[in-house]
């Protein structure tokens, strides 16, 4: 009979599982015996535990410490070696290959992210912490592989990345405003209204933005869903640059006064007169004395005549005196007159 022998030592924290012979019983059931030296029995000085597993299905062996070891029915040897900072590294041979697969056991209070990053999570005392880790989704577009990872943490927590950055998750404001976390890949231009981004936190995790497309990081933006937000009247655009933090550019939006067409080519005196007429017209429209709808132009004939007139610099109309003056004449016409004078003299 083959036995799975488990040696547990609290001082060295080493766990060695050796595989021997497995005896098959009737009905396709395999008996596995676990021997633990930490607990002593009456007869042989060792306590024997027997597990019944179905042949052909993955075997799951639970050893001391709450660690789970799985195998596909093949004889395996698992060795757990204590690592640095209270971590345990397990080496498991991979079927079909000659190498060893290392499994790093993460202690409680720590999150292991794909890519070798470890996030330390510390919650406040007396609060129930709930951590939801979503599996990474891989999307292949035009030969480029992009991997996105999202970690949603409910409750106020402090997370620390492998680079030493400290991230504070604050889902609820002091006024009870519910915050919404949005995770987007840093692969293009992100446009967010400035009103929604007021008082938000921008946190970047993952690889640097100057690496290849496969190692692109993510930017987590915390947006307030409701609350008193002061609209700054601008649009915030986050453009990934060469640094680790994306650059933020603010573009002014057209206001109510810019949406209405302004008269062109007027001086200061005319502009002030236009403003006075607008105020007077708004007052009459509010009183209901004149309709609010205005025609495009008052008289079509005058509009055609104005469009047909010649204009000088700045769109000004030529006065009759300026038309007759020699410096305002057409240069081609002046050349023709000069040639006529030369012919007459000769």
Curated annotation (Swiss-Prot):
<keyword id="KW-0010">Activator</keyword>
<feature type="short sequence motif" description="Subunit association domain (SAD)">
    <location>
        <begin position="265"/>
        <end position="288"/>
    </location>
</feature>
<dbReference type="GO" id="GO:0000978">
    <property type="term" value="F:RNA polymerase II cis-regulatory region sequence-specific DNA binding"/>
</dbReference>
<dbReference type="GO" id="GO:0005634">
    <property type="term" value="C:nucleus"/>
</dbReference>
<dbReference type="GO" id="GO:2000648">
    <property type="term" value="P:positive regulation of stem cell proliferation"/>
</dbReference>
<keyword id="KW-0238">DNA-binding</keyword>
<feature type="compositionally biased region" description="Basic and acidic residues">
    <location>
        <begin position="310"/>
        <end position="327"/>
    </location>
</feature>
<keyword id="KW-0805">Transcription regulation</keyword>
<dbReference type="GO" id="GO:0001228">
    <property type="term" value="F:DNA-binding transcription activator activity, RNA polymerase II-specific"/>
</dbReference>
<dbReference type="GO" id="GO:0045944">
    <property type="term" value="P:positive regulation of transcription by RNA polymerase II"/>
</dbReference>
<protein>
    <recommendedName>
        <fullName>Nuclear transcription factor Y subunit alpha</fullName>
    </recommendedName>
</protein>
<dbReference type="GO" id="GO:0072089">
    <property type="term" value="P:stem cell proliferation"/>
</dbReference>
<dbReference type="InterPro" id="IPR001289">
    <property type="entry name" value="NFYA"/>
</dbReference>
<feature type="compositionally biased region" description="Basic residues">
    <location>
        <begin position="298"/>
        <end position="309"/>
    </location>
</feature>
<keyword id="KW-0597">Phosphoprotein</keyword>
<dbReference type="GO" id="GO:0016602">
    <property type="term" value="C:CCAAT-binding factor complex"/>
</dbReference>
<dbReference type="GO" id="GO:0003700">
    <property type="term" value="F:DNA-binding transcription factor activity"/>
</dbReference>
<keyword id="KW-0804">Transcription</keyword>
<comment type="function">
    <text>Component of the sequence-specific heterotrimeric transcription factor (NF-Y) which specifically recognizes a 5'-CCAAT-3' box motif found in the promoters of its target genes. NF-Y can function as both an activator and a repressor, depending on its interacting cofactors. NF-YA positively regulates the transcription of the core clock component BMAL1.</text>
</comment>
<keyword id="KW-0090">Biological rhythms</keyword>
<dbReference type="GO" id="GO:0048511">
    <property type="term" value="P:rhythmic process"/>
</dbReference>
<keyword id="KW-0539">Nucleus</keyword>
<dbReference type="GO" id="GO:0005654">
    <property type="term" value="C:nucleoplasm"/>
</dbReference>
<dbReference type="InterPro" id="IPR018362">
    <property type="entry name" value="CCAAT-binding_factor_CS"/>
</dbReference>
<feature type="DNA-binding region" description="NFYA/HAP2-type">
    <location>
        <begin position="295"/>
        <end position="320"/>
    </location>
</feature>
<dbReference type="GO" id="GO:2000036">
    <property type="term" value="P:regulation of stem cell population maintenance"/>
</dbReference>
<dbReference type="Pfam" id="PF02045">
    <property type="entry name" value="CBFB_NFYA"/>
</dbReference>
<feature type="region of interest" description="Disordered">
    <location>
        <begin position="298"/>
        <end position="346"/>
    </location>
</feature>
<feature type="modified residue" description="Phosphoserine">
    <location>
        <position position="325"/>
    </location>
</feature>
<dbReference type="GO" id="GO:0045893">
    <property type="term" value="P:positive regulation of DNA-templated transcription"/>
</dbReference>
<comment type="subunit">
    <text>Heterotrimeric transcription factor composed of three components, NF-YA, NF-YB and NF-YC. NF-YB and NF-YC must interact and dimerize for NF-YA association and DNA binding. Interacts with SP1; the interaction is inhibited by glycosylation of SP1. Interacts (via N-terminus) with ZHX2 (via homeobox domain). Interacts with ZFX3. Interacts with ZHX1.</text>
</comment>
<dbReference type="GO" id="GO:0003677">
    <property type="term" value="F:DNA binding"/>
</dbReference>
<dbReference type="GO" id="GO:0043565">
    <property type="term" value="F:sequence-specific DNA binding"/>
</dbReference>
<comment type="similarity">
    <text>Belongs to the NFYA/HAP2 subunit family.</text>
</comment>
């Amino acid at each position: 009979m083959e036995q799975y022998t488990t040696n547990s030592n609290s001082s060295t924290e080493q766990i060695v599982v050796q595989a021997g012979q497995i005896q098959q019983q009737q009905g396709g059931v395999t008996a596995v015996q676990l021997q633990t030296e930490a607990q002593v029995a009456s007869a042989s000085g060792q306590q024997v535990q027997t597990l019944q597993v179905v042949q052909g299905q993955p075997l799951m062996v639970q050893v001391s410490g709450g660690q789970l070891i799985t195998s596909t029915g093949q004889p395996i040897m698992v060795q757990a070696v204590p690592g640095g900072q209270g971590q345990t590294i397990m080496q498991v041979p991979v079927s079909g290959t000659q190498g060893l697969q290392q499994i790093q056991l993460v202690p409680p209070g720590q999150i292991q992210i794909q890519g070798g990053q470890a996030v330390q999570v510390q919650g406040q005392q007396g609060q129930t912490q709930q951590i939801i880790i979503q599996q990474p989704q891989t999307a292949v577009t035009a030969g480029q592989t992009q991997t996105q990872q999202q970690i949603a943490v409910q409750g106020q927590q402090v997370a620390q990345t492998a680079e030493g950055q400290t991230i504070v998750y604050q889902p609820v404001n002091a006024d009870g405003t519910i915050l919404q976390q949005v995770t987007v890949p840093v692969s293009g231009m992100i446009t967010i209204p400035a009103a929604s981004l007021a008082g938000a936190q921008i946190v970047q995790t993952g690889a640097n933005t100057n690496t290849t497309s496969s190692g692109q990081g993510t930017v987590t933006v915390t947006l307030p869903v409701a609350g008193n937000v002061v609209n700054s009247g601008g649009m915030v655009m986050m453009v990934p640059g060469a640094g680790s933090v994306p650059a933020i550019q603010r573009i002014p939006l057209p206001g109510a006064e810019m949406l209405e067409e302004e008269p062109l080519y007027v001086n200061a005196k005319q502009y002030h007169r236009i403003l006075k007429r607008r105020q007077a017209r708004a007052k009459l429209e509010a009183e209901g004395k004149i309709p609010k709808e205005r025609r495009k132009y008052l008289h079509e004939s005058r509009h055609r005549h104005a469009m047909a007139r010649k204009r000088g610099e700045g769109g000004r109309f030529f006065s009759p005196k300026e038309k007759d003056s020699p410096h305002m004449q057409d240069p081609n016409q002046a050349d023709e007159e000069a040639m006529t004078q030369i012919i007459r003299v000769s």
